[in-house]
Curated annotation (Swiss-Prot):
Reaction(s) this enzyme catalyzes, per UniProt: tRNA(Val) + L-valine + ATP = L-valyl-tRNA(Val) + AMP + diphosphate
Lineage: Bacteria, Bacillati, Bacillota, Bacilli, Bacillales
Protein's UniProt name: Valine--tRNA ligase
Described purpose of this protein according to its UniProt entry: Catalyzes the attachment of valine to tRNA(Val). As ValRS can inadvertently accommodate and process structurally similar amino acids such as threonine, to avoid such errors, it has a 'posttransfer' editing activity that hydrolyzes mischarged Thr-tRNA(Val) in a tRNA-dependent manner.
E.C. numbers: 6.1.1.9
Domain of life per record: Bacteria
Encoding gene per record: valS
Main location: cytoplasm
Length: 880
């Protein structure tokens, strides 16, 4: 699809080029891993997005970084696999489908399990297509021939294998335990699916009367509705206040049920009254105390958060309505004697927002300690997972060291059905890859597995495991890098590591690059409730994918959050526009040059040598920084090289030979320009793939696509140290003269007299080599250069490294008029200095004004003083 013979469009319109190139790349199969044994493999698996809707800016950021790595490695000659896929997202997807059914006046129970799951598969297909369209608009170089879904048969086989193996090792068990229960979605939640928020609540202080009528014992709770399930009161065995009561019974208010006073070391004697009500079915700590003392477990709530038959007169009431009523009843009985305001941390469901209920339930669990221990041990070996930035390794280890057993069963229909069956008569439990042969005598467990159970197997289940001879598993596992946000280190990263170690004997990835969250311009997290979210597709429609990608890749340092600014995306579009215009100019002056005509052997100008050297430095720096995941620095170096060195300096200097009469110099400059643009497009390609492909196809080139063009390698042949020194001196001189012209309002078209005093003969030789550039870009009527030049009268001077510049002012401006103008400016600044200093010496102002306001005044003072000094120096210079 070469476009070398076609002229580039005048204007840069990303929308005109982006979709066509993605189609071209897909049709050309440039992104497909080749399994070429002569190449070293490089593998990344995409963190699979949920099939619940649109991708957000966080997805765009995450995938942009992965695409940079994938495109780089592909160009470096690796057999690169970037494996795409999606997550079934059990609870999230089921909630979406149920909401859609409610709009039709139906529930999942109206459909039945099989029909509901079928309906959810239809949802998945619709949204999977939508996600692929978004991936395409982002320009992601994914190998779609290997796309996976967490409910694919291959992945389901891996899930069953892992469940069965862990069960056989005693690492998966079924037990009654206090779990986090979401009464809205009616399912268990793992600890990390619970969001804790500080809530204004109350401590309710009650007195439980002793059964023998001899006094009462004081307890307190934030959840008085749970008292209906109390089965004991606990005190510390060494608490002298209560030692005589241990073993006695108290009468539970309202119910009249008698419960014992037990002694347990868990109780904090210093907190409250030192006596604690024990509700084993509704609190994890009480559950443990109950186990130690063989206490009964009385569950007083239904799964939907209403009170059950064990709650007696409160049966059927919502838990919070019950709380209000029970408080009222306890007050009437004289049992509740104090209500104290209390801010405490309350768990909420990440998915529904409901207050989570600690709830006694029979669930499936993974015994975590043995699995966590080997993951912790890994980090002491050479084979450790490298966290970038490394501070996140401590976060990861701290969580692993304090890990609790993982509740993996979910009361849902969408997901991996737990491969366990119960015998209808004997109750025997059977766990296996397939159902028992006499299936009529068995009933399968109704629950599905936590979504993160299958996600934890993603790096190897997608490669064909448990078939360890599967070609992709043998070649591409383990993977090289994982890119993900710090918010799912616990949910996902840690679980992939311990499952990878347990089932493959090696970590699932070498490096983990951690990025932060995308926030709005004020630093707030983007959310639906705040209405501050930004759709990446909207950004692409306005500015193009390249602008968004460059902004996302370069807008933050590793591990930190990224603030989204529309203005910054616009500035990256401007960067693309600058590249477009520079490339268009270059192509217009290449006179139809072919790739074979590029000849870099001829004599090169200072500018040619300098840009070639700067290119080599940029190649070395950019390659090193990408390998170190320093994408922000990559962007900064590329931006500076392209905008400043290539566009603002070299292309301007290249116009001298291009518009000149020397055909040999013209041909060399064309060759240098073609070569530098080609190499620059390759360097920029991983960050801005569309514009670089478009420009590269117009340039003299060989090969089908820049996506598979070789990555630039630093060449000592094109490193010219002398030209670097010459060019820096020339740039300093040209900049200085331009700045002075601007200060004096002398246009570039007006000739000036320029005297340059060189520090020594070496510097003078440099000046002689670059004289034609000084003449072109400073526009002097007279240029005097030497090592013993006297400063002309009434001249401006500027001291630079190695030289001093003198600009005689006679004829350039009316000296008397300019001095008068500057003296007027000096008087104005003097008044501002007096005003601000008077304010800063006012003790009343300093005592009352906010620190920020005082700091602003101090900055003003420094600014005015600096400007006044500059004006005074200029007046002195003009007066001679």
């Amino acid at each position: 699809m070469t476009k070398q013979d076609q002229e580039m469009p005048t204007k840069y319109h990303p929308q005109d080029i982006e979709s066509k190139w993605y189609e071209y790349w897909i049709e050309g199969k440039f992104f497909e891993a080749t399994s070429d044994e002569t190449k070293k493999p490089y593998t990344i698996v995409i963190p699979p997005p949920n099939v619940t809707g649109k991708l957000h800016l966080g997805h765009a950021w995450d995938t942009a970084l992965q695409d940079i790595l994938s495109r780089l490695k592909r160009m470096q000659g690796y057999d690169t696999l970037w494996l795409p896929g999606m997550d079934h997202a059990g609870i999230a997807t089921q909630a979406k489908v149920e909401a859609k059914l409610r709009e039709e006046g139906k529930s999942r129970y109206d459909l039945g399990r099989e029909a509901f799951v079928e309906k959810t598969w239809e949802w998945k297909e619709e949204y999977a297509d939508f996600i692929r369209q978004q991936w395409a608009k982002l320009g992601l170089s994914l190998d779609y021939s290997r796309e996976r879904f967490t409910l694919d048969e291959g992945l389901s086989k891996a899930v069953r294998e892992v469940f069965v193996k862990l069960y056989e090792k005693g690492l998966i068990y079924r037990g009654e335990y206090i779990i986090n229960w979401d009464p809205v979605t009616k399912t268990a939640l793992s600890d990390i699916e619970v969001i804790y928020k500080d809530v204004q609540g109350y401590f309710y202080h009650m007195k439980y009367p002793l059964a023998d009528g001899d006094g009462a014992i004081e307890v307190a709770t934030t959840r008085p509705e749970t008292m209906l399930g109390d089965t004991a009161v606990a005190v510390h065995p060494e608490d002298e206040r209560y030692q005589h009561l241990i073993g006695k019974m108290v009468k539970l208010p309202i119910t009249g049920r008698e419960i014992p006073i037990v002694a347990d070391d868990y109780v904090d004697m210093e907190f409250g009254s030192g006596a604690v009500k024990i509700t084993p079915a509704h609190d994890p700590n009480d559950f443990e105390i109950g186990n130690r003392h063989n206490l009964p477990r009385i569950l007083v709530m239904n799964e939907d958060g209403t009170m059950n038959e064990k709650a007696g007169q409160y049966e059927g009431m919502d838990r919070f309505e019950c709380r209000k009523q029970i408080v009222k009843d306890l007050q009437e009985q004289g049992v509740l004697f104090k209500i104290e305001e209390h801010v405490h941390s309350v768990g909420h469901s990440e998915r529904s927002g409901a207050v989570v209920e600690p709830y006694l339930s029979t669930q499936w669990f993974v015994k975590m300690k043995p699995l966590a221990e080997q993951a912790i041990e890994l980090q002491t070996t050479e084979n450790k997972v490298n966290f970038v930035p490394d501070r996140f390794e401590k976060t990861y280890l701290r969580w692993m060291e304090n890990i609790r057993d993982w509740c993996i069963s979910r009361q849902l229909w969408w997901g991996h059905r737990i491969p366990a069956w119960y015998h209808k008569e004997t109750g025997e439990v059977y766990v296996g890859h397939e159902a028992p042969q006499d299936i009529d005598n068995w009933k399968q467990d109704e629950d599905v597995l936590d979504t993160w159970f299958s996600s934890a197997l993603w790096p190897f289940s997608t490669m064909g495991w448990p078939d360890e001879e599967a070609p992709d598993y043998k070649r591409y596992y383990s993977t090289d890098a994982l890119v993900t946000g710090y918010d799912i280190i616990f949910f996902w990263v840690s679980r992939m590591i311990f499952q990878g170690l347990e089932f493959t004997g090696q970590p699932p990835f070498k490096d983990v690059l951690i990025h932060g969250l995308v926030r709005d311009a004020e630093g707030q997290k983007m959310s639906k409730s705040l209405g501050n979210g930004v759709d990446p597709m909207e950004v692409i429609d306005k500015y193009g994918a390249d602008a968004l990608r460059f902004f996302l890749a370069t807008g933050s340092s590793p591990g930190n959050d990224l603030r989204f600014y529309w203005e910054k995306v616009e500035s990256t579009w401007n960067f693309g526009n600058k590249i477009w215009n520079a490339s268009r100019f270059a192509l217009m002056n290449m006179d139809g040059m072919s790739y074979d005509e590029i000849d870099l052997t001829g004599e090169k100008s200072i500018a040619d040598q300098w840009i070639l050297t700067r290119l080599q430095e940029t190649i070395e720096t950019v390659t090193r920084l990408i390998d170190a995941y320093e994408f922000g620095e990559v962007g900064r170096h590329l931006y500076n090289f392209i905008w400043d060195d290539l566009c603002d300096w070299y292309i301007e200097m290249a116009k001298l030979p291009l518009y000149g009469e020397d055909e040999v110099a013209k041909k060399t400059t064309r060759s240098v320009l073609a070569y530098v643009l080609d190499q620059t497009m390759r360097l920029l390609h991983p960050l801005m793939p569309f514009i670089t492909e478009e420009i590269w196809q117009h340039l003299p080139h060989e090969g089908e696509s820049i996506t598979v063009a070789s990555w630039p390698v630093k060449s000592e042949e094109f490193t010219f140290e002398q030209a670097m020194g010459d060019m820096e001196l020339l740039k300093d001189i040209i900049r200085s003269v331009r700045n002075t012209r601007a200060e004096l309002n002398v246009p570039m078209s007006k000739e000036i007299e320029l005297h340059i005093q060189a520090k020594n003969e070496d510097v003078l030789t440099q000046l002689e080599r670059g004289k034609h550039y000084i003449e072109k870009f400073c526009n002097p009527s007279t240029l005097v250069m030497g090592t013993a030049i006297e400063k002309p009268e009434k001249s401006m001077s500027n001291v630079l490294s190695g030289v001093e510049l003198y600009l005689p002012l006679a004829g350039l401006l009316d000296l008397e008029e300019e001095i008068a103008r500057l003296e007027k400016e000096e008087n104005k600044l003097e008044k501002e200095v007096e005003r601000v200093q008077k304010k800063l010496s006012n003790q009343g102002f300093l005592a009352k004004a906010p620190e920020k306001v005082i700091e602003e005044e101090r900055k003003k003072e420094a600014d005015y003083l600096e400007k006044r000094a500059a004006v005074r120096a200029r007046i002195k210079e003009l007066k001679g």
